[in-house]
Amino acid sequence: MRTIPPSELIINDDGSIFHLHLHPGQVAPTVILVGDPGRVAMVAEFFDSRECEVTNREFHTVTGTYRGKRMTVLSTGIGIGNIDISVTELDALVNVDFATRQEKSEKQRLTLVRLGTSGALQPDIRVGEFVFSRTSVGFDGLLNYYKGRNDVCDLAIEQAFMRHTGWNELLPKPYFIDADRTLFEPFRDTTRE
């Protein structure tokens, strides 16, 4: 197994990961990602119990239980760069042995749920209304650097979009990804299409 060098995995002197300041074991299998650190408290107030709370810069984390299920809520700050840092460090926390700096042979999958706010152009969507995104569109180009990018993207929509808009080839290639449909099931009776 490959040993991950300190230049690629920065571990603080206290054994926590560099940006999030979390230790292995402090991340639940389900992670709710919010942008604003102030929203962490709003979400965590619904927790039945809290086992840890860690803050470093814009990264504020609370891990606890909700209806008996262990969950983590984490603020990422603004922008895709911060989200990339957060998700990369979450993955390392559950899939890398910090003592040996080697990837664990058995990988743990995290369920990540992004919870945020957005403006709306449609007049029938009221302020404060609950909205699910069926598809995510990225213009930042970050996903283009990841292995398996084409396996998760809707390539036909991407090509149609670029043709329709006359997409400038000097810009990063946009990407379109459909949300996991199972996310909508619990809310089917309380939302509209």
Language-model features: locations:
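Metabolite-binding pocket within alpha/beta catalytic cores that recognizes anionic/polar moieties
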Residues: 2-190
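Short catalytic/ligand-gating loop segments at beta-alpha or beta-beta junctions
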Residues: 193
